[in-house]
Amino acid sequence: TWEMVRSELPGRAKMDLLLEFDEIFGLDLDKSAAENAVASGITKTLEVRGGHREQSDYAAADEMRGQLASDGYIVLDTAAGTRARPKTPLELRQEKWASVSSSREIESYLDQPAELDFTFVLNAYGYPSDVKRCIEGMLNHTGSHSVEAIVIDNGSTDGTGELLEEMLAEHPELRVVHCDHVIGDAASKNIGLKQSRGRNIVVLDGSAEITGNILDTIAEQLSDPTVGIFGPWGLSTPDMQHFHEEVDSGDADAMQAYCMAFRREEVNNVGLMRECFRFYRNLDIDYCFQFKDKGLRVVADSSLPLVRHEHRQWTELDDTQRDELSRKNFGRFLKRWGNRPDLLLAADAVGFESHQQFHH
């Protein structure tokens, strides 16, 4: 749908296709939305502009069109008369900065040699103060390492995009990719992975704040070729059904994505994140198993200097929404990995589907 909207098809053809799609989606696109209403002052301006056009004073009419555009309106001149509508959030964003609609539009640098020590990747799903705190934590604790921070503005409408543009001017090591709509958690992070130029990648959540030197420890851990993923908050499970936050140090079955680090070269080995995970929950577990499937370890160290703040993606939803989205994502994980107890640490690990014990 998004590719069609952004295509070179005539407007009428796009509208016909959207209405046909909407027979399935049920969004009532054929009904004029209240957002398309214009203020009485705009209606008066259109009448004055129409008078200029009738008198062939097109210079004055064009000047008024430009003013209406600056005020946030699209003016449409047709044989039946002139109409105007407010610009959509998408149109307003596209006027401010270049944006993408999917990770497929992003060039991958993964086949090119690393140019830096570290790449931070942040999926910015809104909440500007959280994003600012997270970025400052990254950039204030780089030590002697060369770093870049890739922040994906994931369709935000709360001023996050504007904040990121301001921070770009202050931080040359910051790179920003704007998305014209919410593309999902995995797709957003894949943009960062594909664009990364650091030897090691650190994926952070906006709720996490770095408060000290984490990069020396990460570099040391990832110098071990047997370690695939390293981070502070490890998980364990005996049966693929319940992952417990109880691994403070050493090997774990999975790592929570509040902070997870891995070598950039391994992305070509294990693949990108699965973009069927639009909601964040269980994506981290799924990606860890992509590493474990290649014989790589997941290692935890809870002493890393990070603080977890309120996780907005969790608290902004009610219990029903959280449970439904989490359940669907866990089903995606189980469908792929549920019968792979051989990837778990426990000697008597049990697969979800067969519930047959596997012995290492």
PLM regions with names:
Residues A186-A187, F243-E265, N269, Y280:
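A recurrent flexible, glycine/aromatic-enriched loop bordering the glycosyltransferase active site
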Residues C179-S196, E246:
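Glycine-rich, basic loop-to-helix element that forms the pyrophosphate-binding segment
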Residues E136-S146:
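Short, acidic, metal-binding catalytic loop of nucleotide-sugar glycosyltransferases
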Residues W2-L116:
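Structural preference for alpha-helix termini/caps and helix-kink/transition segments
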Residues E209-H244:
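Conserved donor NDP-sugar-binding/catalytic core segment of glycosyltransferases
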Residues S101-A114, G228-P232, T237-P238, A261, ...:
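C-terminal, non-catalytic tails of nucleotide-sugar-dependent glycosyltransferases
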Residues I201:
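Short aromatic/hydrophobic "clamp" motif used to bind/position activated sugar donors
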Residues D153-L163, H181, D205, E209:
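A conserved acidic beta->alpha catalytic loop
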